[in-house]
Amino acid sequence: MHFHERFDVIVVGGGHAGTEAALAAARMGSKTLLLTHNLDTLGQMSCNPAIGGIGKGHLVKEIDALGGAMAIATDYAGIQFRTLNSSKGPAVRATRAQADRALYRQKIQNILQNQPNLRIFQQAVDDLVVENDRVVGVITQMGLAFEAPAVVLTAGTFLSGKIHIGLENYSGGRAGDPPSIALAHRLRELPIRVGRLKTGTPPRIDANTIDFTQMTEQKGDTPLPVMSFMGDVSHHPKQISCWITHTNEKTHDIIRGGLDRSPMYSGVIEGIGPRYCPSIEDKIHRFSDKSSHQIFIEPEGLNTNEIYPNGISTSLPFDVQLNLVRSIQGMENAEIVRPGYAIEYDYFDPRDLKNSLETKTINGLFFAGQINGTTGYEEAGAQGLLAGMNAALQVQGKEAWCPRRDEAYIGVLVDDLSTLGTKEPYRMFTSRAEYRLLLREDNADLRLTAKGRELGLVDDARWASFSEKLESIELELQRLRSQWIHPNSPLVPVLNPHLNTPISREASFEELLRRPEMDYSKLMQIEGFGPGLADPLAAEQVQIQVKYSGYIQRQQEEINKAVRNENTGLPLNLDYKEVPGLSNEVIAKLNSHKPETIGQASRISGITPAAISILLVHLKKRGLLRKSA
């Protein structure tokens, strides 16, 4: 049975990747269908109730700069906002928000329901329709066929998902949801490498059974940050505190005593878990010298008693979970309302993807999110937006686009995945980016919004707001550069008390701001120098561009050198055995990875600069030198 309408893009899955993919394709004018097994769980925060953090917040800002929904939903759902690394340089500062699960889900669903060109339909997908190595549609569990020349798969942890609690296990996509078994079997028939990964979640605790007086209160920041460039503090709901407590030796003894019934340590779980978000049993095993581990007690919302104890993800048996929870200070009488569990699921080797996130073997089929081996809402959302956008571009007969590593953390994420692959759930950190001084949270819109507008991702309201901000920054920078103060100026006696060394020669306002003891708001408050910019985000941008101009210029010069060969394309059908001078190891790795560009090839482990030089000479001789899109 065929559905009565044909679509341009079909998105399978309604999590963070799927929602951003569907919204992106629809914003670009493509007739888009979002299929999900349950409309009520669209935008569900399946694990921790938080958005952002180190590296992750940078991705959220980039999604937002390209017109995505994640940051906007966070501003409407965030019940505590903090700027992490606030005392450090701007490159590593990151916004993190504790979110009300229900409010976040409601806002995402509201955005989806009001997006033109987007249809939503409740059905799980069991099969792909592939003809001559091109996807042409999908078939749902009730046999209903939907047709489209582009399909984006965002299946999360649902592909052959298996939930583990102690030595008991059962099939599931997440707690309370069925897995995607038929679709997983269908995907395993495709010529794409497949593996198993695992992730986990902690038990949820009844807040009424916690003694918060025995814990350390953690309040949000004042003034309140916002997540979206279109956001406003007035969008935030009521703000509340989180709390901090710790495990202890008794906790660790309880965990050690239960390891014989742990699915991880008894060989039941085969999948590899996230290195940077380990289970509590993994922490006790790997860091046996530590006598305690920090636990963040995080509310799941304003109208629920459920608490998320961040730091004790576990798949131990329920009786062990209860005992370990009750061994922690402040939780001696705690009651568990949902047990913690681990989930194992299929993922597909992202080296089998182009940097557009289209599979190399099936035209029109795109993967995004945990199916590519990543972990985290933010990583999923970023991939979803990129995959949905490129699916729409393909249908419209346009070239695919992916930002370079020096342009966005999204570019770092996709390049790492498609070039290096991953054997464990991949999460983003600022340390993964070579050019992080240029890839800051604060300038994500300056880096990406103009490109988003060109691609059709950015609407008129966002574009008007961005253009106004950009103009105000440029005018203020011009003012600071063009206005000067002389040693005999009447402003000097007013200014000197604020300086470490008095004015002895003429200086521009820009030079004054560059002094380490001066900041923009302080300078603008001095008579004769203001009033300056009222928009705090624009003012911050002016300060950073002035203070870090030398460092930024040097990093830009490094980028210009690196980019020369970065986008030199490599034919996907190139047999590296035919390239004289390459070692057998290099040939094997290049034939296995099939990099799309010289830049990707250079980042494969074991590919030497000499091998890259040989490749460039070969391409030039054969007339194959070309720039990738």
Curated annotation (Swiss-Prot):
Keywords (alphabetical) are: Cytoplasm, FAD, Flavoprotein, NAD, tRNA processing
PROSITE patterns, per the entry:
GIDA_1 (PS01280), GIDA_2 (PS01281)
Names of the cofactor(s): FAD
Any Pfam family hit: SAM_GIDA_C
Give the binding site residues for FAD. Answer: 13-18, 125, 180, 370
Q: Does the keyword tRNA processing apply?
A: yes
One GO term of the cellular component aspect?
cytosol
| SUPFAM superfamilies noted in UniProt | FAD/NAD(P)-binding domain
Residues binding NAD(+): 273-287
Assembly and oligomerization = Homodimer. Heterotetramer of two MnmE and two MnmG subunits.
- PANTHER family the UniProt entry points to: GLUCOSE INHIBITED DIVISION PROTEIN A, PROTEIN MTO1 HOMOLOG, MITOCHONDRIAL
**Known function:** NAD-binding protein involved in the addition of a carboxymethylaminomethyl (cmnm) group at the wobble position (U34) of certain tRNAs, forming tRNA-cmnm(5)s(2)U34.
Q: Which family, according to the similarity comment?
A: Belongs to the MnmG family.
* Record protein name field: tRNA uridine 5-carboxymethylaminomethyl modification enzyme MnmG
Q: Give the organism the record lists.
A: Shewanella sp. (strain MR-4)
Encoding gene per record: mnmG
